[in-house]
């Protein structure tokens, strides 16, 4: 399976600009016969703690991604945030080229040192989906520091993805932890980080 990792420079709290960039990357990947394109954490808003800026509903976002996937005949994995009641949810969804939602994961470990846990609700389960013969489990950023969930996922998954908004100051940790999770669990780990300034 040919996989592309889209390291986007995210436009801060600007859904329209970011979704246009997602579409551009997706079209390019499709033209190169990529079967799965993966985007970073919160790639439609940037890593924001301002949940009032999250105006699109989960249904609206998923419908938009479905259309991009179907129109380009490509599977898409993408991180986004939504407002749910008084808190947010940090999500990673995988949508098939036929428009089916294969996985819709909510981050289990919000980044406590940045106060994410006070603003975003945590998830309570691991999602595993299948594309072709590969089983895939998506995780998000700070989840990478918790090896137990990777061990659980690796009992079934061939591939684990980690969409992130990981800062340059801790780049060594990012690379070391991705390698460690792959070595520990003997599976493929795809890390997709954003670029640019937060």
Give residue ranges: language-model regions.
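Active-site catalytic loop in hydrolytic enzyme cores
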Residues: 84-155, 169-176
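Short beta-strand-to-loop element that shapes/binds the nucleotide-sugar donor at the catalytic cleft/hinge
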Residues: 78-83
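Short beta-strand segments enriched in small/hydrophobic residues
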Residues: 1-9
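Short, acidic/polar
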Residues: 17-28, 144-151
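CN hydrolase (nitrilase-like) catalytic-core segments centered on the catalytic cysteine
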Residues: 59-77, 145-198
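Active-site beta-strand/loop signature of hydrolases that rely on acidic residues for catalysis
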Residues: 3, 18, 26-52, 69, ...
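Alpha-helix N-cap and loop-to-helix initiation/capping positions
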Residues: 13, 17, 21, 53-60, ...
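Glycine/Thr-rich phosphate-binding loops of Rossmann-like dinucleotide-binding domains
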Residues: 13, 47, 170
């Amino acid at each position: 399976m040919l996989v592309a990792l889209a390291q986007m420079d995210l436009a801060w709290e600007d859904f329209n600009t970011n979704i246009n960039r997602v579409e551009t990357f997706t079209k390019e990947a499709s033209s190169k016969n990529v079967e799965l394109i993966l985007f970073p954490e919160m790639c439609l808003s940037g890593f924001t703690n301002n949940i009032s800026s999250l105006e699109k509903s989960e249904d609206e976002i998923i419908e938009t991604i479905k259309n991009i996937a179907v129109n380009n005949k490509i599977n898409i994995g993408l991180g986004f945030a939504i407002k749910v009641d008084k808190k947010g949810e940090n999500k990673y969804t995988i949508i098939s080229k036929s428009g089916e939602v294969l996985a819709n994961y909510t981050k289990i470990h919000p980044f406590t040192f940045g106060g994410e846990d006070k603003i975003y609700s945590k998830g309570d389960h691991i999602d595993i989906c299948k594309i072709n013969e590969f089983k895939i489990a998506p995780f998000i950023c700070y989840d990478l520091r918790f090896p137990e969930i990777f061990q659980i996922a690796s009992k079934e998954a061939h591939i684990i993805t980690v969409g992130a908004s990981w800062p340059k100051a801790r780049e060594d940790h990012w690379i070391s932890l991705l390698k460690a999770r792959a070595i520990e669990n003997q599976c493929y780990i795809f890390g997709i980080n954003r670029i640019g300034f937060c």
